[in-house]
């Protein structure tokens, strides 16, 4: 489900991986209200399974989760040739590790509490950059 194959927000899929039920609900409902297709996972293990099954266009990822943490999810996403190109937005209350998340391969970091509209705007910006990069690569 590459962003370059999808012309509108109505066909873009986001996977929200967060163990906080309230955060998952708030982010998911807002993103749905903007026309995005939203899938949810309450922990990293479930998130990894859904990433491989669904191939979302964007992943929203919390770091501190049970079973498999966000760091492990991010590492797995970046190491797989199938998922390495999926943009990952880390949304976490662990603000002192922001720089480390970029070194680990995230595309954007937002500190909790993060307004859902900011998450949406960040997702849109990442998808625009990805689409532009694909257009530039195709024109070479």
Enumerate the predicted regions with their spans:
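Charged docking surfaces used in two-component/phosphorelay signaling
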Residues: 25-33
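Short hydrophobic/Thr-rich beta-strand motif most characteristic of the beta2 strand and flanking loop
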Residues: 35-42, 50
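Active-site beta3 strand of CheY-like receiver
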Residues: 54-60
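Receiver (REC) domain active-site loop signature in two-component systems and cognate sites
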Residues: 65
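Hydrophobic/aromatic residues positioned on beta-strands within the core alpha/beta folds
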Residues: 89-91
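C-terminal output helix
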Residues: 114-125
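The C-terminal output helix
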Residues: 124-140
């Amino acid at each position: 489900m590459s962003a370059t194959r999808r012309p509108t927000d109505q066909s873009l899929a986001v996977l929200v991986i967060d163990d906080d039920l309230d955060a998952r609900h708030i982010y998911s409902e807002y993103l749905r209200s903007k026309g995005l297709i939203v899938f949810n996972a309450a922990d990293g293990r479930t998130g990894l399974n859904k990433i491989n099954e669904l191939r979302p266009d964007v992943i929203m990822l919390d770091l501190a989760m049970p079973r498999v943490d966000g760091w492990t999810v991010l590492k797995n996403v970046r190491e797989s040739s199938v998922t390495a190109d999926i943009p990952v937005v880390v949304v976490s209350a662990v603000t002192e590790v922001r720089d480390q998340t970029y070194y680990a391969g995230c595309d954007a970091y937002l500190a909790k509490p993060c307004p859902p509209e900011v998450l949406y705007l960040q997702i849109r910006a990442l998808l625009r950059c990805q689409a532009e990069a694909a257009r530039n690569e195709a024109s070479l």
